[in-house]
Regions:
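Short, low-complexity, Lys/Arg-enriched N-terminal segments of secretory-pathway carbohydrate enzymes
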Residues: 1-46
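Short, acidic, metal-binding catalytic loop of nucleotide-sugar glycosyltransferases
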Residues: 331-343
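Conserved catalytic core of nucleotide-sugar-dependent glycosyltransferases
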Residues: 410-488
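Short acidic-hydrophobic catalytic motif
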Residues: 8, 37-183, 188-277
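Short beta-strand-to-loop acidic/aromatic patch adjacent to the donor-nucleotide binding site
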Residues: 396-408
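A conserved hydrophobic helix/loop-capping motif in glycosyltransferases and polysaccharide synthases
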Residues: 314-322, 336
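Active-site-proximal specificity loops/subdomain of glycosyltransferases
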Residues: 347-399
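C-terminal catalytic/acceptor-binding lobe
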Residues: 58, 265-297, 327, 479-664
Length: 664
């Protein structure tokens, strides 16, 4: 049926003829009635769809209006029946109901599965694997996993190679540092008892183990305990023969969880305790810092240093993924007189959470560095990135102190650098100032106020001049593909360019780290454990100017001239080679044909039980130390310029390596 549009005649003042003419002018091709053609099917569907949308919109608006009106009515009714304070009670009641619902949603127990075997160790909680180590030739020993007793979250994961010396002591220390109440899971991979001594076994027994005293060579073992409480389960498999391993053991236990409020300490609020709470609620193994009753302080108030020359010198701490080392190091550094936390930055090689959390625990600045390279090259690149970042963070700093995470700092660490820093300004022949003496052992050093000059770069806590790094070292630093040790590179003649480092007779740092890329417990025992370490808080370095270039030559010549030449017919390995007299100066001459001839020196170093892996700590082919209470100078002949003072009747001592024999 056609649609019709009827046009009305608007006559107004116009006559009939004008009206018709006007209509013709407006619609020259239309009659009084306009007939439209029928709409096509697509247009009809479009109109229908639009109409439906309008209807839906109207219905939605209506529903919302009804909801608003209903809500308003109920609010009015509640306000009519409420009294002051009722609303707070309602909110608190609702909060309690929500808390109860959350607690009901948390599991009341954990299903823990533990595997101990020759090739693999694993732990799963409620079907989720949280520890798995099946890598060849790695992960040997006892794996220890610490879980939160309220949530089941992982708080610590450590591996102790108890096949190696002293790892049982490290494990015992760690277990003693874990707070009571925590869930602890143990599992052996490969072998875990060869070096596990009785004290460690006794500790495991006190924790609940019934097998600790009998676990033997290549036996498999797993245990789950609640520290200070129940032992939930233990599984053991004995090795039948020396060349075989015990059968794999699988331990399955159900561990009940405790309420959250029973797993946290009620420390009073402070900024210090806020950091403590953040740390201790999800990380374990740090002992008294997380004690509920007597927590160790996190804020230190060391003495100030009179005329402190390093108060504004940035301190770069070179760290990796050894958080317990970092924790120990930071406590000693922040306790040292003159420490300024605002100038300390911890640089972490990799995106490891726990070292960063340790840094934040002490309120310090921490920067995670993206690893570049592998092994030695990675360490070298980490040092470079850290040094560059240090001088970028502190653009006005002329110096920087660099110290590693596995070092204790002496009480006068900053005082030592404050007193000696001016040497870098006044003597261009000085390369660095180090807190470490490579040859400073308990039996070879004794004067905390004495300084030496050495051609080697010791590291292990040292003061670097900005101009040296920016103008020379940074651009020439070994690239990532070069597997070089950064400190060995800095000792190269073409890099050092005849300059020397200043070191103390008694070191101001102590190397305690027994694990690392180039470190193990045996190496630590032999070469670092008996190093001397200053513990005096106030030491005034004497005759600082004596180590300036020209003054030092006069000093050494004076010592040689007044010294007593030892009996060169005796072996340096003989106990009576050095007389038991204190306060003297003893002189010893050894064979050294050229600057790289260290054959005899390394054998002498073995006899003296000091660093003997490579030549270190010498000045113009002369080594200086204390032995039996007297100063000792060892001079290489004919290479050293001091060899001219050798009496004609004295033949320099010559020693060759003894194959298969190590004198330590």
């Amino acid at each position: 049926m056609p649609l019709c549009l009827t046009m009305d005649s608007h006559r107004g003042a116009m006559g009939p003829q004008q009206s018709r003419a006007s209509r013709r002018s407006l619609f020259p091709y239309a009659s009084h009635t306009l007939v439209m053609r029928p709409m096509t099917r697509p247009r009809i569907l479009t109109k229908v769809f639009q109409s439906l949308l309008v209807i839906v919109l109207l219905v939605t608006i209506g529903i919302n209006i009804m909801f608003i009106m209903d809500t308003s009515r109920r609010l009015q009714e509640e306000s009519q029946h409420s009294v002051p304070g009722d609303n707070d009670d309602h909110v608190h009641a609702e909060s309690r109901r929500n808390t109860l619902r959350l607690q009901e949603s948390v599991p009341k127990s954990l299903a823990i599965d533990v595997l101990s075997s020759q090739m693999k160790v694993s732990v799963s909680v409620d079907g989720t694997t949280i520890l798995e180590d099946g890598e060849d030739h790695k992960g040997r020993g006892i794996h220890v996993l610490v879980l939160n007793q309220a949530s089941g979250s992982v708080m610590a994961l450590r591996t102790f190679d108890t096949y190696s010396p002293h790892e049982d002591e490290a494990m015992a220390l760690f277990l003693n540092m874990v707070s009571d109440g925590r869930i602890i899971v143990f599992a052996i991979k490969d072998e875990g008892t060869f070096q596990m001594k009785q004290p460690a076994r006794d500790l495991l027994k006190r924790l609940g183990s019934k097998r600790a005293q009998v676990i033997g060579w290549r036996d498999m073992w797993a245990m789950v305990i609640h520290k200070g409480g129940k032992m939930f389960g233990e599984s053991y498999s004995k090795s039948s023969e020396f060349n075989t391993w015990g059968a794999p053991v699988i331990l399955r236990v159900e561990v009940p969880l405790v309420p959250f409020e029973d797993s946290e300490c009620d420390w009073p609020y402070s900024e210090e305790n806020r950091r403590r709470r953040d740390f201790c609620n999800h990380i374990e193994g740090y002992g008294s810092v997380c004690s509920c009753t007597d927590p160790a302080p996190l804020i230190f108030n060391p003495e100030t240093i009179l005329n402190n020359q390093v108060n504004d010198v940035p301190v770069a701490i070179i760290a990796s993924n050894r958080p317990h080392y970092l924790y120990r190091m930071l406590r000693s550094l922040l306790s040292a007189n003159g420490a300024n936390p605002d100038m300390i930055t911890v640089f972490i090689d990799g995106y490891f959470e726990e070292p960063l959390e340790v840094t934040k625990l002490f309120g310090l600045r921490g920067i995670q560095h993206t690893p570049i390279g592998a092994k030695n090259a990675r360490i070298s690149q980490h040092y470079k990135a850290s040094l560059t970042a240090t001088f970028n963070i502190f653009p006005n700093a002329k110096y920087a102190i660099i110290v590693e995470e596995d070092l204790d700092a002496s009480p006068d660490f900053f005082s030592y650098f404050s007193q000696t820093k001016r040497l870098l300004e006044e003597d261009e022949s000085i390369y660095c100032i180090s807190a470490w003496n490579d040859q400073g052992y308990e039996h070879t050093s004794e004067d905390s106020s004495l300084l030496y000059r050495v051609e080697t770069m010791p590291g292990l806590g040292w003061l670097l001049k900005r101009s040296l790094y920016k103008d020379e070292l940074e651009a020439k630093w070994p690239t990532p593909e070069k597997m070089w040790d950064w400190d060995m590179w800095m000792r190269l003649p073409e890099v050092r360019r005849g300059r020397e480092c200043i070191i103390p007779d008694v070191s101001r740092t102590y190397h305690f780290g027994a694990s690392g890329l180039n470190m193990n417990s045996y190496f630590q025992d032999v070469y670092f454990k008996k190093h001397s370490f200053n513990t005096q808080p106030h030491v005034e370095m004497r005759n600082i100017d004596d180590v300036k270039k020209n003054n030092y030559e006069e000093l050494i010549v004076g010592l040689i001239k007044k010294g007593t030449v030892l009996d060169h017919t005796k072996s340096p390995c003989d106990e009576n080679f050095i007389p038991d007299r204190k306060g003297d100066v003893f002189i010893m001459y050894i064979k050294m044909d050229d600057p790289k001839d260290f054959v005899t020196w390394l054998q002498v170093a073995k006899c003296f039980k000091i660093w003997d892996l490579d030549p270190r700590g010498y000045h113009k082919s002369m080594w200086r130390m204390h032995m039996k209470g007297s100063e000792m100078l060892v001079i290489g002949v004919p290479n050293s310029e001091y060899s001219k003072y050798k009496p004609m009747s004295v033949a320099p001592i010559s020693m060759e390596p003894i194959k298969g024999k190590v004198r330590r």
